[in-house]
UniProtKB/Swiss-Prot annotation:
Pfam families: PTS_IIA. This is PTS system lactose-specific EIIA component. The PTS EIIA type-3 domain is phosphorylated by phospho-HPr on a histidyl residue. Then, it transfers the phosphoryl group to the PTS EIIB type-3 domain. It is found in: Cytoplasm. The keyword Transferase applies. InterPro entries: PTS_IIA_lac/cel, PTS_IIA_lac/cel_sf. Induction: Induced by lactose, galactose and galactose-6-P. Repressed by glucose.
Length: 104
């Protein structure tokens, strides 16, 4: 995989992870407003985006496992960072929504 392909893959991961992050933060706002069903829907939609980002990441891992040399790019590293922090946010969001439910 050349640098341009790695950069494009990085942008793809950033886009999916960014969409997921936005949905998760919107879910937090919904939970804060007492709209728990909406919050759960947004978390599920975010999870779909994370799955898409993970598929892109998995394609990268598969290419490397097949012996393809991967030229790293800052964009690809940025995408990986975005994805991992978004996954962490999703894990925390479930707990935060539950705390809002208990407090109402």
């Amino acid at each position: 995989m050349n640098r341009e392909e790695a950069t494009l893959l990085g942008f793809e991961i950033v886009a999916y992870a960014g969409d997921a992050r936005s949905k998760l933060l919107e879910a937090l706002n919904a939970a804060q407003a007492g709209e728990y069903d909406r919050a759960e829907e947004l978390v599920a939609a975010a999870d779909d985006c994370i799955v898409d980002a993970h598929k892109a990441q998995t394609s990268l891992l598969a290419k490397e496992a097949q012996g393809d040399d991967i030229e790293l790019s800052v964009t690809l590293m940025h995408g990986q960072d975005h994805l991992m922090t978004t996954i962490l946010l999703k894990d925390l969001m479930k707990h935060l929504i539950e705390l809002y439910k208990r407090g109402s």
